């Protein structure tokens, strides 16, 4: 299976995987509106890959099969202040 990967011009580090190039018929209209005009990034031969950089390849395959698309969102940003407080033993809910 070869899938097509597009990046969002509106949302940083957000990617949309679809089964066929320029076929967004299975992607909900609301998602396409938020995603904005898709910019082609690459074609990926999923059948020949064992992993992907930022996504679980089995989840990508499964969602492409079930929904016809896979949306890759950016990883959550680390809250360095909260991590530092935790390392010092400071409870973030303490008054």
UniProtKB/Swiss-Prot annotation:
Signal peptide span: none
Highest taxon, organism lineage: Bacteria
Protein name as annotated: YcgL domain-containing protein Sden_1630
Xref: InterPro entries: YcgL-like_sf (IPR038068), YcgL_dom (IPR027354)
A Pfam family per the record: YcgL
Alphabetized PANTHER family for the sequence: PROTEIN YCGL
Residues annotated as domain YcgL: 1-85
